[in-house]
Every structure is written in C-alpha cells, then in structure tokens.
From Swiss-Prot:
PROSITE patterns for this protein: PX
UniProt gene name: SNX41
Region (Disordered): 1-94, 475-505, 558-597
Keyword list, A-Z: Autophagy, Endosome, Lipid-binding, Membrane, Protein transport, Transport
Stretches with biased composition (Acidic residues): 1-12
GO biological process: autophagy of mitochondrion; protein transport; reticulophagy; retrograde transport, endosome to Golgi
Major localization listed first in the record, in broad terms: membrane
UniProt biased composition (Low complexity): 482-497, 558-589
Stated family: Belongs to the sorting nexin family.
Any GO MF annotation of the entry: phosphatidylinositol-3-phosphate binding
UniProt function note: May be required for cytoplasm to vacuole transport (Cvt) and pexophagy.
Protein name (Swiss-Prot/TrEMBL): Sorting nexin-41
Any GO CC annotation of this UniProt entry: endosome membrane
Species per Swiss-Prot/TrEMBL record: Candida albicans (strain SC5314 / ATCC MYA-2876) (Yeast)
Length: 681
C-alpha cells in the first residue's frame, strides 16, 4: 500500500482552505490583486500535476460542498469551467466561495422548513491521535441532504448562545458534561464509554428534533443554527461565535434588552449590575416569586408616598399570579419526576438482574438436558427434549427482556423522563433571570431615592446658609454619601433642631427645575424634618454607599480667593477696616457657596433625569418580559403534557408487546409439551 499521498490527503481533509480560498478567513471583503498570467499558468500546471498523482478519492465533505455549488440554477457543467474555477481560487477572489456559502445557507433554511425533513445522528467517531468524539449530523429530505460533523463542545456552545439570544424561550436540553472522575473511569471501561457515546447520540437527536420541529419559529430561523448545520463552518465554528448576532450580546445579560439581547440601545449599559448572577448556573439563591411580589407591593406603596415626581399608574409593577403558580408547579413536577427517575433506575436494575438470572437458568437447563440425554440414550428421549425446550423458552424470554431494556425502556422512557426534568430546570432558569431583573428594577428605585436624599440635604444646606444661622455643620453631617459635600461645610454648631423654613428656599426657584419645585412643594406640605431619611425606607444607613449612581462631574469656574483673604485677614493688624473686610469676605463666601450648591443641584437633576429614563425603560421591559414568559410557560406546559402522554402510551405499548411475546413463547412451549405427553400415552 502506497503512503506517498497519505499526508497530503489528511492535510486536504483538515485544512480550512479546502472549502475555498484561505484569504476569506483573513479579509473576506477585499479581494487580492490577480497574479501575472505567467504565474497563473504555472500554478495551473502544478494543480494538474497534483491531481494526476493523487490516487485516493476525494473526502466526503467535498461532495457535500460541490453539491451546494451545483445547486445554483445558472451553474454550468464543471468540465467547461475547470480552468476558470482554478484561476478564481488562485487569484484570491472569494466571490465563488461567498456565492456558494449564501446558496448553502438558503438551502439550509429551505431544508429546515421542509415538512419531510429528517434529522439523525448517523455516526460517531474519534479523531486521529485524540480523545475527541465527533458526531455526524444528517439533514435529509427527498431532494436535499446535508452532512456535518460536530463535537460535544460545539453542541454546548450552540445551546448556551441560543439561551443568551432568546432569554424568554425554553431551549431543549443536552446531556450534562461528565466530570474528570467519570472521564477517567470511562477510559478504563471501554464498554461504558461506548454506552455513553450512544446515549449522547440519542440526546443530541432529541435536542435537534425538539429544536427544529417543536420549538418556536425564531429558533429555526436563527442564523447561528444555520451556521451550525453549514459544512463551511465545520472547521471554523469559533468564527460563527464571533459574528453577529452573538457578538452583539453583552457579557452580562442583565445589561441587555431581555426581549432582544442584540439591541444596541446605550441606556442598557447604564443599568446597575446585580452581584451573584450567573446565567448558566441552575442554582437560585433568591426568594420565590411570591415573596418577591410582596416586596414589590411595598415598593409600590413607598413610591406612591415618596415619589417627588408624582406616582404614575403605568409605573406600578407586580408579578402576575400565573407566573407565581408556574414556579410552584415547576418545583412540584421536578420533585415528582425526580422520584420517578429514581424508581426507573431501580426498575432498570431489576430488569437487568432478571435478564442475568434468565441467562443462568437457560444455560443450566440446557446443560441439564445434555446430562439427561447422556444418561438415557435412545431415539425417544422425551425428557431431554422437554428440558431443552424449557431452556430455549428461557433464552427467548431473556432476549425479549434484553431487547426491551436496550431499545424501549432506556431510550424511549428513562431518558425522555430525564429530559423532562432538564426542561423544567431550564424553565426555572428563565424564572431566575426574571427575578434578577426585578432586583435590578428595585435597585434603580433605591438609587433614585438616594439621589432624592442628596437633593434634600443640599436644599437644607442652601436654606440654612442663606438665612445666616450658621447651621451648615448640622446639615453637612447628614450628607453621608455625597463626596463633594465637604467643600460646602462651614464651621458651626449642631444644635439646630427646629423644622425647616421653606421661605429660605425661594432662591432655588430660579433654577426652573420641575424636580426641585416638586421637592420644595413636598417640603412645605409634609414638613420634612432633618431626621427624615430616604435610605431608611430600605433599611440600613449605608445603602447610599452600596447603591450609587453618578454621572461625570464638570466643576464650575468660581472665585477661590476666600481662603487667601482669610489668611491675609488673620495676619493683618487690628484696624477699623477689618470689620468691613470681614463682611465683604462673608458675602463673597456666601455667593461662592450658593453657586456651588446650584451646580450640585443641577448635576443631581441630570442624574435624576437619567434614572427616570432607566426606570421607564426597565419598567417597559419588565411588562414585556412578564407577558413573554407567561406565554412561553403556557405553551411549554401544553407541550409537556402532550409529550408525557406520548411517553406513557409508548411505554405501555412496549411493555404490552414484550409481555405478549413472552406469553406466546410460553404458550407454544406448553402446547408442545402437552402434545409430546399425548404421543407418549
């Protein structure tokens, strides 16, 4: 056997350039300048010489790709344009490859929408000099067939990215990845490794069937799914994960549009991040929806009482009772199916034990029939024949049970039940995402209340300073989270315990700010005292430190000569002009102080406006997300009920067929035994 072209064939089979010009991977949009005609002729001769020395057939994937290129109605016979085809590849023009890829993508889309489509995992193989297993997927219809190979990690990355692209849909599950310990055990026990590979093939088939035939149409039309079935992306799946729409999704899904995560609205990047959120984990450390809904009712009441802008009815948000019941039902169903899964494992173990018993019993009966035949030799040895038939009937029974376990019990009952559990866990994952969005929504209100607290503190400072009572130290001590408030602190006493006088705030009306005017109105009507605290609404005096929202600050240009004047006044001797200088210095300091307060109030006004936009955006998203999840769960439960009914009917039918086959065997054995007894008599 010649091995001259062996490595060349392997290189051709594993080289991305096999699917076209490799320049498309570097720069798919800018063609390379064609080489001179002499170089073209030389390259053409080299290609012909290589083809003449090649004895091995072309890889299977070439037939798939060439089939896609011939699918165009305007394509001509290949022998007429062979030279032109090679020239286009050598020139570096990826036009033919692009056209072929577009044509194949259109074929995949048409194939997925074909009513006669069949999806199957036809093969699994291990890569050369590697422990990686690849699974061969076949999409076939009466007119089209596409074959592509995928690894387990590529199945998992497809599903993980579909979860991010469609956070309101339930994506079909795939089997969990094995731990390192189980991987080591599988390498030792080869038969167990084979059973795991076969199990994964069945799970992947169920995954693709549910994804294409029983899921939302959005999943079937997703470009990422089309690339998963595209042989051109077989060796460059990483490129598909770095292209739109996957590349448009932010790293943290809480900073994206929950309905369309690929939305590029810049406001989502300003949303607060909730610690502990892991979208790919099934662990949920938050309270149930019923408890969270009670907290939302409290939040709505607090907003009605303390919202300075005035509470609007469309901003009121609560969790519908349907969604709360869905969560309860999912947990209950998971518990029931988990118990059923444990019972199925015990049942399968008992069936296998019975098969082993029947094997031993059948073998012993056959040996016993031989011993009887040897002890009583003759032409009419009815006892030996009866024992042999008894053993054969035992063998038929064990074969029926073994076939039932391998072909019906495990793949058509036990594994689908386990898949239902994974489905329900995925639905709880959507509810967990919904909970974290609610927490994010509540944090926005906490941030807004903290800004209100800063607004009132600055208003108090402006009012007391303008009255000249020297109480700035008291009010400055109440601004626990405003880092810039220390610039406006003056030495004073902390003995001002009286109520605030709203007449001292008239100078703030010049700002013409709706929020500040509403704040002044509430101050005059509710008589908010200095002990009122916004962060007391949610417990703890450090909430403003934990939840903070700040926009970039542009410091105003103000006169800063007050400190120099004070130092000069301290060093100057006593004179009649000292009192006049002190009065002038105080007036300048008061003016600078008022300017600083106005600037801070304007800055807080901007932050409040931005928070109002975020709250309105998040509120709209929560209403849409709630409606989408309710619709998804209603459809999901109806599908689960149909799937469960089909599983039960199939399981009962398989059990009935097995027991009928065993009963038929034993009836035949009984009839043969009765007939032989009659003949003897």
């Amino acid at each position: 056997m010649s091995t001259d072209n062996l490595f060349e064939d392997i290189e051709q089979d594993n080289n991305p350039s096999f699917y076209g010009n490799p320049s498309i991977l570097n720069d798919p949009y800018r063609p390379i300048q064609p080489p001179p005609p002499q170089q073209q002729q030389q390259q053409h001769q080299e290609n012909e010489s290589k083809q003449s020395h090649t004895k091995s057939p072309k890889p299977p994937l070439q037939s798939i790709h060439s089939g896609t290129s011939n699918a165009h109605p305007q394509s001509q016979p290949q022998h007429k344009h062979k030279h032109k085809h090679n020239t286009s590849l050598n020139n570096g023009y990826p036009n033919e490859l692009v056209n072929s890829t577009i044509g194949l993508s259109n074929r995949i889309l048409e194939l997925l929408n074909d009513s006669q489509l069949q999806v199957d995992i036809i093969n699994s193989e291990k890569l050369v000099n590697s422990s990686v297993i690849v699974y061969t997927i076949e999409l076939s219809s009466p007119t089209t067939k596409i074959v592509v190979k995928r690894r387990y990690s590529e199945f998992k990355s497809l599903r993980d990215n579909l979860l991010k692209l469609f956070p309101t849909l339930i994506i079909p599950p795939i089997p969990e990845k094995h731990s390192i310990l189980s991987y080591l055990l599988n390498t030792i026990n080869h038969s167990h490794e084979i059973s795991i590979i076969e199990m994964r093939k069945r799970y992947f088939k169920m995954f693709l069937d549910d994804l294409i035939f029983q899921s939302d149409y959005k999943l079937k039309n997703c470009p990422l799914l089309h690339k998963f079935f595209d042989p051109n992306y077989e060796l460059c799946w990483y490129n598909a994960l770095n292209e739109p729409p996957v590349s448009l999704i932010p790293d943290n899904l809480l900073l994206a549009n929950p309905i369309n995560p690929a939305d590029q609205n810049g406001l989502y990047s300003l949303l607060p991040i909730v610690n502990g959120f892991d979208f790919n984990s099934h662990i949920d450390n938050l309270s149930n929806l019923k408890k969270i809904n009670e907290d939302l009712y409290k939040l709505n009441d607090q907003v009605k009482l303390y919202e300075l802008k005035g509470f609007e009815q469309d901003l009121e948000f609560s969790i519908p009772e349907e969604l709360i019941q869905f969560e309860i039902k999912f947990h209950q169903t998971i518990k029931i199916l988990t118990d059923l899964n444990k019972l199925n494992s015990k049942t399968t173990k008992n069936y296998k034990s019975m098969v082993d018993t029947l094997i031993d019993l059948g073998g012993n009966l056959n040996n016993f029939s031989l011993q009887v035949y040897q002890q009583k030799s003759g032409s009419n040895n009815e006892l030996s024949e009866a024992i042999e038939k008894f053993g054969s009937t035992m063998d038929q029974s064990f074969l029926n049970f073994e076939s039932f376990i391998l072909n019906q019990l495990v793949p058509q009952w036990q594994e689908p039940v386990d898949q239902l559990i994974l489905y329900l866990q995925n639905s709880l994952g959507l509810i967990k995402f919904y909970k974290y969005k609610i927490v994010q929504f509540k944090i926005l209100y906490k941030l807004k209340f903290n800004k209100f607290q800063q607004l009132i503190n600055l208003t108090n400072i402006g009012g007391v300073s303008s009255s000249g009572s020297g109480g700035g130290g008291l009010l400055a001590s109440r601004i626990s989270t405003d880092n810039d408030s220390n610039n406006s602190n003056n030495s004073g006493n902390n003995n001002n315990d009286g109520d605030l006088d709203t007449e001292n705030f008239d100078h703030l009306k010049e700002l013409n700010s709706p929020t500040i005017n509403n704040a002044l109105k509430n101050l005059s009507t509710k008589k908010i005292s200095k002990k009122s605290s916004w962060y007391g609404l949610f417990g703890g005096n450090n909430q403003t430190k934990k939840f903070n929202f700040q926009l970039p600050i542009e410091e105003p240009t103000t006169a800063t000569g007050s400190t120099e004047q004070q130092s000069q006044q301290q060093s100057a001797p006593n004179s009649p002009q000292r009192e006049q200088q002190q009065q002038q210095s105080q007036s300048q300091s008061h003016h600078s102080h008022q300017t600083s307060i106005r600037f801070k109030l304007n800055h807080i006004e901007k932050e409040l406006n931005k928070l109002n936009q975020l709250i309105e955006l998040c509120n709209q998203d929560m209403h849409k997300l709630t409606e989408a999840l309710v619709n998804t769960f209603e459809e999901f439960l109806s599908k689960i009920e149909r799937k469960w009914l089909q599983l039960m009917i199939t399981y009962i039918q398989n059990c009935k067929n097995m027991f009928e086959a065993n009963l038929t065997n034993w009836k035949e054995f009984k009839e043969s035994l009765v007939n032989e007894t009659r003949e003897v008599n």
